[in-house]
């Protein structure tokens, strides 16, 4: 089994490296990451991860398996992705300040024949109230514009603002590595037990 890690995220590269499983990085530009408007919020990252995996199918060798992921921050029923501007990042942090939110990461695993699996892991996170000065300092010093919800739990803001979490810390960073490891172990034992993707079926009626 040869793992293809299909992500440009340095955090996911770092996390997967910690599993001591050899991998190569492969990137395809321009994958459509949109999702249907009626999709339940917690299924969104799983749906997007599956779309990413399916885009790699034709490039996979018989002994390769591609791993894709997508992370979103959920506040109430609102989804926060990556901010597109400093103003949007600031608005996101104001929205997270002093309240609970959820971080959901969807992961998809697929071989060349189209068989695979996908799942979503969710972690609950509680933020302390953030002052205007703290938000401005974080944005100015850490530029978190490549992160869902405009923050990285492993950075300064995680030390000073996160009161508690419930679930996987690494999931908040972008990859639930314990579940990834368990799934890859099952794949090595018998990949024929896996089913064709997609698993998240959208009813367009």
Regions found by a protein language model. Give the residues of each.
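N-terminal polybasic phosphate/anion-binding patch
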Residues: 1-65, 78, 133, 178-179, ...
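Residue-level signal for inorganic ion chemistry
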Residues: 16, 49, 70, 89, ...
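Short beta-strand-to-turn element immediately C-terminal to the catalytic PLP-Schiff-base lysine
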Residues: 74, 108-111, 128, 162
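Anionic-ligand binding region
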Residues: 90-94, 105-125
């Amino acid at each position: 089994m040869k793992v293809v890690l299909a992500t440009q995220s340095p955090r996911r590269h770092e996390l997967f490296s910690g599993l001591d499983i050899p991998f190569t990085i492969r990137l395809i530009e321009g994958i459509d990451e949109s999702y249907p408007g009626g999709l339940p919020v917690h299924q969104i990252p799983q749906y997007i991860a599956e779309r990413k995996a399916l885009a790699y199918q034709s490039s996979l060798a018989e002994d390769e398996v591609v791993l894709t992921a997508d992370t979103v921050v959920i506040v109430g029923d609102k989804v926060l992705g990556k901010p597109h501007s400093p103003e949007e990042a600031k608005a996101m942090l104001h929205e997270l300040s002093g309240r609970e939110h959820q971080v959901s990461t969807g992961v998809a695993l697929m071989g060349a024949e189209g068989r695979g699996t996908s799942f979503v892991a969710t972690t609950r996170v509680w933020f302390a109230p953030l002052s205007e000065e703290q938000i401005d300092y974080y944005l100015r010093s850490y530029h978190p514009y490549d992160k869902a919800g405009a923050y990285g739990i492993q950075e300064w803001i995680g030390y000073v603002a996160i009161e508690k979490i419930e679930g996987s810390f690494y999931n908040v960073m972008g990859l639930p590595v314990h579940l990834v490891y368990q799934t890859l172990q099952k794949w090595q034992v018998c990949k024929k037990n896996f089913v064709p993707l997609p698993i998240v079926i959208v009813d367009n009626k």
